[in-house]
Swiss-Prot record:
Function: ATP-binding (A) component of a common energy-coupling factor (ECF) ABC-transporter complex. Unlike classic ABC transporters this ECF transporter provides the energy necessary to transport a number of different substrates.
UniProt keywords, alphabetically: ATP-binding, Cell membrane, Membrane, Nucleotide-binding, Translocase, Transport
Keyword Lyase in annotation: no
Membrane topology label: Peripheral membrane protein
InterPro entries in UniProt: AAA+_ATPase (IPR003593), ABC_transporter-like_ATP-bd (IPR003439), ABC_transporter-like_CS (IPR017871), ABC_transpr_CbiO/EcfA_su (IPR015856), ECF_ABC_transporter_ATP-bd (IPR050095), EcfA_1 (IPR030947), P-loop_NTPase (IPR027417)
Short name of any one Pfam family annotated for the protein: ABC_tran
Family, similarity comment: Belongs to the ABC transporter superfamily. Energy-coupling factor EcfA family.
This protein's GO CC annotations: ATP-binding cassette (ABC) transporter complex
Residues involved in ATP binding: G42, H43, N44, G45, S46, G47, K48, S49
Primary location: membrane
The enzyme's E.C. designation: 7.-.-.-
Protein name: Energy-coupling factor transporter ATP-binding protein EcfA1
Domain ABC transporter positions: 8-242
Length: 269
């Protein structure tokens, strides 16, 4: 399979948890464009988080194939590919493994047997990129939720990944911390040409993406640009998704355009 523009490809993927009678994913196919921000959205139980687990090897497909840079992912090559894909989870407390910030960032490097001098350099650079270098010696209980997520991103960046997955990474943050984290991820994506995959139930987060995949009942419901996805907002509310605030206001005002960012709403008003 040859697709130079896609970093990850799902081809007819189905998955079923052992405890479930029905399939969580049913014949799912999509491409993740290289160097872009893709949001995979859906309500609870839509299959979106299972997709993240399959991408990083926590779970394995029952049928179908997953490709990474045109190479089919198998048991034989997965560990080699895995270091290219980093993930930031929902709860920052559950992913903090070091006693202080710099040890947490160094943890993954130690597992990959990175030499000490190189490790020290990478830890410092990664913390500097996320504006946490001054807190390198802090304990996790001295950090806010947003700061812990910054450390989680630094831990991923230190490994020089090609792809970063955010699995509901902003859902436990207050609005300001959430926006700050998204701004940071956008900056990291731009500076390092990293592919971002955001797994979320929050459609306002999808508004910032280059590419959006909407999941519903284990299948791909819609796929396209943010403008294309929000062009028919009724299709999104029909499957239980909550529309972003600016789009709701735009509808209330009777404007024709469905897709509207916060900045666009201000201009309209």
């Amino acid at each position: 399979m040859e697709d130079k523009n896609s970093v990850i490809v799902f081809k007819n993927v189905s998955f079923q948890y052992q405890s479930d009678a029905s399939f969580t994913l049913k014949d799912v196919s999509f491409n993740i464009p290289k160097g872009q921000w893709t949001s995979i959205v859906g309500h609870n139980g839509s299959g979106k988080s299972t997709i993240a687990k399959l991408m990083i090897g926590i779970e394995k497909v029952k049928s179908g194939e997953i490709f990474y840079n045109n190479q089919a992912i198998t048991d034989d090559n997965f560990e080699k590919l895995r270091k290219d894909i980093g993930i930031v989870f929902q709860n920052p407390d559950n992913q903090f493994v070091g006693s202080i910030v710099k040890y947490d960032v160094a943890f993954g490097l130690e597992n990959h047997a990175v030499p000490y001098d190189e490790m020290h350099r990478r830890v410092s650079e990664a913390l500097k990129q996320v504006d946490m270098l001054e807190r390198a010696d802090y304990e996790p209980n001295a950090l806010s939720g947003g700061q812990k997520q910054r450390v989680a991103i630094a831990s991923v960046l230190a490994l020089n990944p090609s792809v970063i997955i955010l699995d509901e990474a902003t859902s436990m943050l207050d609005p300001d911390a959430r926006q700050n984290l998204l701004d940071l991820v956008r900056k990291v994506k731009s500076e390092h040409n990293i592919t971002i995959i955001s797994i979320t139930h929050d459609l306002s987060e999808a508004m910032e993406a280059d590419h959006v995949i909407v999941m519903n009942k284990g299948t791909v419901y819609k796929e396209g640009t943010a403008t294309e996805i929000f062009d028919n907002a009724e299709e999104l509310t029909r499957i239980g998704l909550d529309l972003p605030f600016p789009i709701k206001i735009n509808q209330m005002l009777g404007h024709q355009t469905s897709f509207l960012t916060y900045e666009g709403l201000v201009d309209q008003l």
